[in-house]
């Protein structure tokens, strides 16, 4: 559907009862408000709907709280999970007095990033392809009270359940630590669930490809077809929503926390990127690994700004429990063809149209609109300023001698470091008014609240290490 009239015709012919308007907050979570169909007409889509922005963390103060949700009718689809027929529509957030995009709206930032590309003349389209991993548990308990702090996770797949009593017996098929990549059922216990997740995403407009079990016990990944920056961020929101919903229907619970389990692999979100112009791939050329000079400069920009990028690509305190050596996490800021230990990988392909950069340090806790936009702006800064990424590193970086390893820069070691890096290095984000300084400052304040709570809260491991000191 491309016009409000088409949406209204669809509503009538499909007996739609409600329209659900959705938008993304600065932390990356979908929010929504549902309207009875008697409220929906052409003006509903043309004029937008007012709401209170002061209730959204990181947005307006209560004395200037009015904001406007403007539906993007091209995103309209029937939500497959609601009992009453409900049309879901993704919205942009506007200033009600001017009708201009709100500077702190993540989707608005992503749209400005695409406009910025076209204004430079370097390209007309930027494609993104995220690979977001996640865990599914049968039972999760956690508490963060001053006198009772801890968590407990359970899944039928966990190796610790080898002697657990189950109704009907313990059937014994269990994935070992770091042994979960690609096994068939019954070791893979979630085949049908993942298929249902993929099917529900397709119903909501996402372009789907595949699904499989991941390395850790209870860890999974579904594949989305790459798309333009804003569309792909929209689809990743659908991806997360459908995974949460289907897991819930199965009586299970999904999480996109980067590192919920100590000692096993964490969940990453490798992000493939490429720029096109006039229907031709800008990243294909005759340089290293058949890349263009522009692509190498793009990589140079990502590596140069990686520490400030971490504030958007790895925005949780938990993100930095994944970004440690030894768990397939790409902490070293280098690039290579096919080498998965480098933070920027060039996937092998003979097809010039498939030439792309895979940035491997992001995780699924990221707000996709902000993460994709920031990665793109860093790469564009590399192209515009011809930033040399240095020589490629084709050997296994984790096997380098300590002296050589110290010469390679790394991603941040904590969210505090990432936010401090963003405070110092953000001029590249301000170009084209894509990110506004006001948003960056408010984002840092918002995330620093999380850092402060985490740093001030005693941890169970500290009791284990220090209680008897």
Swiss-Prot record:
Keyword NADP included in the entry's annotation: no
Domain GS beta-grasp: 14-98
Activity regulation as described: The activity of this enzyme could be controlled by adenylation under conditions of abundant glutamine.
Residue positions binding Mg(2+) 1: 131, 270, 358
Binding-site positions, Mg(2+) 2: 133, 214, 221
Record flagged with keyword Nucleotide-binding: yes
Family per similarity comment: Belongs to the glutamine synthetase family.
Name of the protein described by the UniProt record: Glutamine synthetase
């Amino acid at each position: 559907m491309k016009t409000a009239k088409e949406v209204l015709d669809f509503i009538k012919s499909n007996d739609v009862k409600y329209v659900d308007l959705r938008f993304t907050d600065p932390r990356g979570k979908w929010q929504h408000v549902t309207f009875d169909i008697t409220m929906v007409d052409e003006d509903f889509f043309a004029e937008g709907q007012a709401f209170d922005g002061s209730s959204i963390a990181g947005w307006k103060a209560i004395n200037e709280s009015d904001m406007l949700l403007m539906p993007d009718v091209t995103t309209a689809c029937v939500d497959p999970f609601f009992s009453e027929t409900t049309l879901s529509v993704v919205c942009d957030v506007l200033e009600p007095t001017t009708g201009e995009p709100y500077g702190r709206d993540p989707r608005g930032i992503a749209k400005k990033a695409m406009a910025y590309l076209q204004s430079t003349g370097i390209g007309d389209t930027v494609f993104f392809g995220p690979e977001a991993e996640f865990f599914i548990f049968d039972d999760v308990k956690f508490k963060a009270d001053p006198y009772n702090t801890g968590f407990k996770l359970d899944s039928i797949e966990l190796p610790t359940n080898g002697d657990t009593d189950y109704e009907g017996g313990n059937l014994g098929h269990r994935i070992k630590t770091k042994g979960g990549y690609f096994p068939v059922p019954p070791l893979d216990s979630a085949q049908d669930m993942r298929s249902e997740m993929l099917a529900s995403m397709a119903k909501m407009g996402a372009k789907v490809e595949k699904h499989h079990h991941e390395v850790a016990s209870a860890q999974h990944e579904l594949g989305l077809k790459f798309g333009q920056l804003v569309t792909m961020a929209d689809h990743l929101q659908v991806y997360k929503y459908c995974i949460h919903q289907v897991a819930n229907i199965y009586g299970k619970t999904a999480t996109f926390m980067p590192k919920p389990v100590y000692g096993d692999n964490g969940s990453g979100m490798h992000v493939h990127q490429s720029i096109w112009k006039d229907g031709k791939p800008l990243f294909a050329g005759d340089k290293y690994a058949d890349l263009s000079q522009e692509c190498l400069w793009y990589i140079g920009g990502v590596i140069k700004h990686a520490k400030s990028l971490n504030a958007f690509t790895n925005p949780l305190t938990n993100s930095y429990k994944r970004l440690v050596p030894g768990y397939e996490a790409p902490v070293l800021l280098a690039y290579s063809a096919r080498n998965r230990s480098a933070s920027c990988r060039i996937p092998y392909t003979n097809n010039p149209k498939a030439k792309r950069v895979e940035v491997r340090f992001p995780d699924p806790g990221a707000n996709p609109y902000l993460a994709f936009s920031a990665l793109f702006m860093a790469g564009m800064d590399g192209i515009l300023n011809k930033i040399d990424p240095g020589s490629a590193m084709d050997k296994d970086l984790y096997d380098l001698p300590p002296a050589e390893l110290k010469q390679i820069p790394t991603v941040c070691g904590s969210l505090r470091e990432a936010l401090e890096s963003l405070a110092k290095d953000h001029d590249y984000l301000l170009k084209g008014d894509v990110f506004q300084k006001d948003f960056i400052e408010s984002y840092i304040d918002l995330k620093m609240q999380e850092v402060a709570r985490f740093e001030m809260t005693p941890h169970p491991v500290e009791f284990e290490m220090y209680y008897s000191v």
